[in-house]
Amino acid sequence: MSMLVVVTENVPPRLRGRLAIWLLEVRAGVYVGDVSAKIREMIWEQIAGLAEEGNVVMAWATNTETGFEFQTFGLNRRTPVDLDGLRLVSFLPV
């Protein structure tokens, strides 16, 4: 089990309700919980299927250099980039 954080923007209410089944919504669109890898993958499938035009970032604790991993869904000005094996975030100007 590992700590999981999901941040959503402009997603349908049905996805927010679905996330609230497994995670605690601590602020509007911000969900946290302690889940297994299998549940994390299942949550991501729900996000990919229900997010529509919204965007989502999901981050979880891992045994890596940074101590976490993340993935994104949908259009966003922040895009993940790989720099020599280190995942960073590039901010695109308007």
Swiss-Prot record:
Question: What's in the domain note?
Answer: Substrate DNA-binding induces large structural changes that generate a surface for DNA-binding across the Cas2 dimer and formation of an optimal catalytic site.
Q: What is the effect of changing residue 65 to R?
A: Slight decrease in spacer acquisition, Cas1-Cas2 complex formation or CRISPR DNA-binding by complex. Loss of spacer acquisition
Q: Which InterPro entries match?
A: CRISPR-assoc_prot_Cas2_sub
- Which Gene3D superfamilies does the record associate with it? 3.30.70.240
Instruction: Say which species the protein is native to.
Output: Escherichia coli (strain K12)
Top enzyme class of this protein?
hydrolase
Please provide an example of a Pfam family that matches this protein in its UniProt record: Cas_Cas2CT1978
Question: Self-association or partners: how does it assemble?
Answer: Homodimer. Part of the Cas1-Cas2 complex. Forms a hexamer with 2 Cas1 dimers sandwiching a Cas2 dimer. The DNA lies across a flat surface extending from 1 Cas1 dimer, across the Cas2 dimer and contacting the other Cas1 dimer. Only 1 Cas1 protein from each dimer is catalytic, the other interacts with the Cas2 dimer and possibly target DNA.
Result of mutating residue 18 to A?
A: Very little spacer acquisition
Q: Recorded E.C. number(s)?
A: 3.1.-.-
Q: Keywords in UniProt for this one? A: Antiviral defense, DNA-binding, Endonuclease, Hydrolase, Nuclease
What protein is this chain from? CRISPR-associated endoribonuclease Cas2
Family, similarity comment: Belongs to the CRISPR-associated endoribonuclease Cas2 protein family. E.coli-subtype subfamily.
Could you provide one GO biological process annotation from this protein's UniProt record? CRISPR-cas system
Query: What is this protein's expression induced by?
Result: Repressed by H-NS. Activated by LeuO. Activated by the BaeSR two-component regulatory system, possibly due to envelope stress. Part of the casABCDE-ygbT-ygbF operon.
Deleted gene: phenotype: Loss of plasmid silencing.
